[in-house]
Amino acid sequence: MAATTANPEMTSDVPSLGPNITSGNPGPAIQGGGTIVQRAVKRRPGLDFDDDGEGNSKFLRCDEDQMSNDKERFARSDDEQSSADKERLARENHSEIERRRRNKMTAYITELSDIVPTCSALARKPDKLTILRMAVSHMKSLRGTGNTSTDGSYKPSFLTDQELKHLILEAADGFLFIVSCETGRVVYVSDSVTPVLNQPQSEWFGSTLYDQVHPDDVDKLREQLSTSENALTGRILDLKTGTVKKEGQQSSMRMCMGSRRSFICRMRCGNSSVDPVSMNRLSFVRNRCRNGLGSVKDGEPHFVVVHCTGYIKAWPPAGVSLPDDDPEAGQGSKFCLVAIGRLQVTSSPNCTDMSNVCQPTEFISRHNIEGIFTFVDHRCVATVGYQPQELLGKNIVEFCHPEDQQLLRDSFQQVVKLKGQVLSVMFRFRSKNREWLWTRTSSFTFQNPYSDEIEYIICTNTNVKNSSQEPRPTLSNPIQRPQLGPTANLPLEVGSGQLAPRQQQQQTELDMVPGRDGLTNYNHSQISVQPVATTGPEHGKPLEKSDSLFAQDRDPRFSEMYSNINADQSKGISSSTVPATQQLFSQGNTFPPNPRPAENFRNSGLAPPVTIVQASASAGEMLAQISRHSNPTQGTAPTWTPSTRPGFSAQQVASQATTKSRSSQFGVGNFQSPSSFSSMSLSSTSTASSGAAAYPSLTSRGSNFAPETGQTAGQFQTRTAEGVGVWPQWQGQQPHHRSTSSEQHVQQPSTQQPNQPEVFQEMLSMLGDQSSSYNNEEFPDLTMFPSFSE
């Protein structure tokens, strides 16, 4: 161990000793040797061997390291200085760039604020965020939508552009037009200008908008169409702040492309006819109640107030080239006004039609099957004067005229049977101020879709106003109403004047009024024939006179008639003239002894069935004229020969008689009062009598009106003859009905020749050709009489 310590180089020379000793078994000697070895290892990093032959090499290495560090430090400082300069220069360049960028952005935002109308209208200059927000809103408004959809579509996909245009114009109740800003020439106008201004499109095409507006509004229109800067120079009013400021550079921005235009002007209204079917209800009301500007003189144009709103656009649009023949082609890019014109209905305070617009004429009510009000529209206050609570729980029949109550009850019974179909009836409704208002009620039933039971009846009650209709007093005499049969088939449009013949068809017995036996010496040439209207709101009007219609003191002709009544009472139709068993119309359809059901007497469009009401005046005179033209020496049933009355068939007689029977004067029950017909006796039923077989309405001239006196059971007493006794009541009542030339021919039977067809010329004009004979092939639904063969 001493040798090892004294000579450490020996241990270093033997490389295998160290590891062996160190890795040997633990022991005292080995432990000590291991410690010495560790100590020798620690001393090895020393500079013991550097002292041998090296000298001052230690100090020289340190100097070299210091010099190299100084060089590196100086080089690093130079690099840092250059990088700092570069960074400083870069920062200066970035600041300059940012400053220039901010200046550019500020300039652009300022320009944007001048372009956007909402920004330029502000009194103070807004901040950049406000300018951007207003610019976005303005772009949305120019695009036409308020929401930012992803696909950019702002209209429904199931609508085409044309359908969308029509819907927009219909909803706006206006018309679209495009006008050139430079010349005012109309480039385009929609077809909806016709219902708005009563002018066709052709009057707008090729003209200028200056020609369509009022002369006093031309300067205002030119100002709105102008795009120059000095068009609106001056002072403007700021609506938000209420201050008046001078208009500077904003005028040019306000007049630029895309700026909005909104102005009111007076446009010329035309006189072209407008089809109400082609317009919706709102447009039709606007057309009827279009506001005017005072009274219109004859020959002067009529102007209405129109509100125009739109935008200034570039014309022609991008990608569209004008044709060569266009007058504005080759002038470069121009501007045009795309606007919608709408009527300002409420702008004229002196409009005479405003009361009609504000005053409702109808109200909706709901009833149960009995007719009791269960719901009433609030418009009933302005229509009939009643509050809704005053009508609820009451029957509508209580407010109906006594003469129309049965008609209204029958209509409610029929609408229940129709099950959903609309039934219209006219009656007189008592308003709150005790006035009778002509009211048309269109009713239908609502059925439960599950149980198929009728829940209630819905009625639309319309006040029918007619300025030419004069109020007429009603008959004070009591009336007897016929009962409507269970099989009656009423049409969908039934008025009181149309329902009366149907009720009289189903009446089995009528009151017997004494005194009507025969009218032989009846001078037709002294009685004026009155035309009778068949349609209109005057169905079922009562007579103007409530006294006896056939009193002897009214006319001296009645005394002459009454003197011959008893003398002609016993006259009947001889067997040589008309046999009791012979039928005039033997082609197939005869009259059975039993009354026909009501559905066999249905109405047709052109030739209704023969249901002569007792007041059928012109029918009786017509039969009298036919009776005079018949052959007195004929021994068989009287017929029409071509020499006597060419081309005049029996259906024409029946149709003409019924046409006159459907009179507005012959309302329900007007001629069923016994006191009103003291000189008439109704001795047969309305449809047929027992054992009726013949049609004895045509006799010789010697026994005029003989069918009225023949009351035998073997003959069919037609109701056509009853109309003869009704003629005197219409004499002298000219204020309500005018006599036409068609019926003046009938007043001169003595001068008419058998070959003169002009006796019924205008009467037959309602039925078509006068020379042709009508048969069942032309009227398949007429089963009353077959064609009469000559």
From Swiss-Prot:
InterPro entries in alphabetical order: bHLH_dom, Circadian_TF, HLH_DNA-bd_sf, Nuc_translocat, PAC, PAS, PAS-like_dom_sf, PAS_fold
Cross-link Glycyl lysine isopeptide (Lys-Gly) (interchain with G-Cter in SUMO2) per UniProt, renumbered positions: K58
The family database entries (Pfam families) matched by this protein are listed as: HLH, PAS, PAS_11
Q: Please give the name of this protein.
A: Aryl hydrocarbon receptor nuclear translocator
Q: Where is the PAC domain?
A: 424-467
Could you list this entry's UniProt keywords, alphabetically sorted: Acetylation, Activator, DNA-binding, Isopeptide bond, Nucleus, Phosphoprotein, Repeat, Transcription, Transcription regulation, Ubl conjugation
Which tissues and organs express this gene's product?
Was expressed at almost the same level in all tissues except for the heart, liver, and small intestine.
Q: Where is this region: DNA-binding?
A: 88-128
Please give the residue ranges the record annotates as the region Mediates the transcription activity and dimerization of the AHR:ARNT complex.
167-171
- What assembly does the database describe for this protein? Monomer. Homodimer only upon binding to a DNA. Efficient DNA binding requires dimerization with another bHLH protein. Interacts with TACC3. Interacts with HIF1A, EPAS1, NPAS1 and NPAS3; forms a heterodimer that binds core DNA sequence 5'-TACGTG-3' within the hypoxia response element (HRE) of target gene promoters. Forms a heterodimer with AHRR, as well as with other bHLH proteins. Interacts with NOCA7. Interacts with TACC3.
- CDD domains associated with the record: bHLH-PAS_ARNT, PAS
- Where is this protein localized, as stated in its record? Nucleus
Q: Per the record, where are the segments of Low complexity compositional bias?
A: 673-695
Q: What is its main location?
A: nucleus
Q: Which SMART domains match?
A: HLH, PAC, PAS
Keyword set includes Acetylation:
yes
Q: Where is this region: Required for heterodimer formation with HIF1A?
A: 112-168
PAS domain ranges (all copies): 161-235, 349-419
Q: Quick one: which gene encodes this?
A: ARNT
Cross-referenced NCBIfam families: sensory_box
Q: Which GO terms describe its molecular function?
A: DNA-binding transcription factor activity; protein heterodimerization activity; protein homodimerization activity; sequence-specific DNA binding; sequence-specific double-stranded DNA binding
Name the PROSITE patterns on file: BHLH, PAS
